[in-house]
């Protein structure tokens, strides 16, 4: 009936490969609080639906990419390991002091802008 919100691991447990478990809980709390502040007096259930819509996609993408990272970090095949390591080296050579597009998407999320509905860039996660 729209009166309960889950957040953090209760809503979307994370594997440790992007160190996002606690971070996602903090993002959830911020977006939920701000969404309720902005819309909760008029229609709390609608505010909770908005919170879910704002957070669900990002959390699901992070879960998927964390599963992908698990595979990358635990390869058994020597050829696959060599291919992975070559990709890491190329990135380091091409961009020694910067972040990948994926890292920017991961670490530059602005919960305030998301809650206000003014930042849709977080939806477009580049392929890893």
What kind of region is each of these model predictions?
Residues 1-68, 72-73:
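Conserved mid-domain beta->alpha element of the FAD-binding
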Residues 12-13, 31-40, 53, 74-128:
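C-terminal lid/capping helical subdomain adjacent to the catalytic/cofactor pocket in oxidative enzymes
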């Amino acid at each position: 009936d729209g009166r309960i919100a889950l957040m953090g691991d209760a809503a979307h447990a994370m594997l440790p490969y992007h160190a996002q478990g606690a971070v996602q809980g903090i993002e959830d709390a911020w977006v939920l609080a701000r969404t309720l502040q902005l819309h909760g007096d008029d229609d709390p259930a609608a505010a909770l639906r908005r919170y879910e819509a704002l957070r669900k996609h990002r959390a699901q993408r992070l879960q998927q990419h964390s599963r992908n990272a698990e595979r990358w970090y635990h390869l058994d095949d020597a050829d696959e390991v060599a291919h992975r390591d070559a990709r890491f080296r190329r990135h380091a050579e091409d961009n020694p002091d910067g972040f990948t597009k994926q890292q920017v998407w991961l670490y530059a999320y602005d919960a305030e802008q998301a809650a206000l509905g003014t930042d849709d860039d977080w939806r477009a996660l580049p392929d890893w």
